[in-house]
């Protein structure tokens, strides 16, 4: 059975290492018969969450703000798997990904108990060095508290310049992880 997969790509580099990893993942997932939609968050107009608590009143437009999140919300609702992809910035995910993820709270506001939709997820990250521990802690904590199930993590270190991920085993790991989803 085909799965709906969305990739929230928080990298500002169109041809960077995070994008190389997500491309490998998407190729594997599509070869396994899944539908993949990728959002390049840095190229979208996404306002930050303002904590207004006015989300969830209209399930079709869950956030009070109107911007490019309107493209992400329906895909997120339909997704079986959410891929969180980001370069490692100051031992965390990029602001682009954090901003978009914060805005997904509007979907939880549609539920009277603020429950998030149950999803499976993947974490994909690239970094100049290593030091993924803080991001992994955030991701594991997120999984636990919103009730998602992790399908895996691809953490590719020591990739500074675009193209550095080529030939690294993490590229095949991303492909194989995508291919394993069905």
State where each predicted segment sits.
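Short glycine-rich anion-binding loops that position phosphate/pyrophosphate groups of nucleotides
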Residues: 88-90, 128-129
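Structural signal for conserved beta-strand scaffold positions within catalytic alpha/beta enzyme cores
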Residues: 38-40, 65, 123, 152-155
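Catalytic nucleophile loop
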Residues: 83-86, 120-122
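Glycine-rich phosphate/pyrophosphate-binding loop and the adjoining helix
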Residues: 31-32, 140-182
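Cofactor-binding loop segments of dinucleotide-utilizing enzymes, especially the Rossmann-like FAD-
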Residues: 10, 41, 125-128, 156
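A generic structural signal for short coil/turn motifs at secondary-structure boundaries
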Residues: 13-16, 130, 161-165
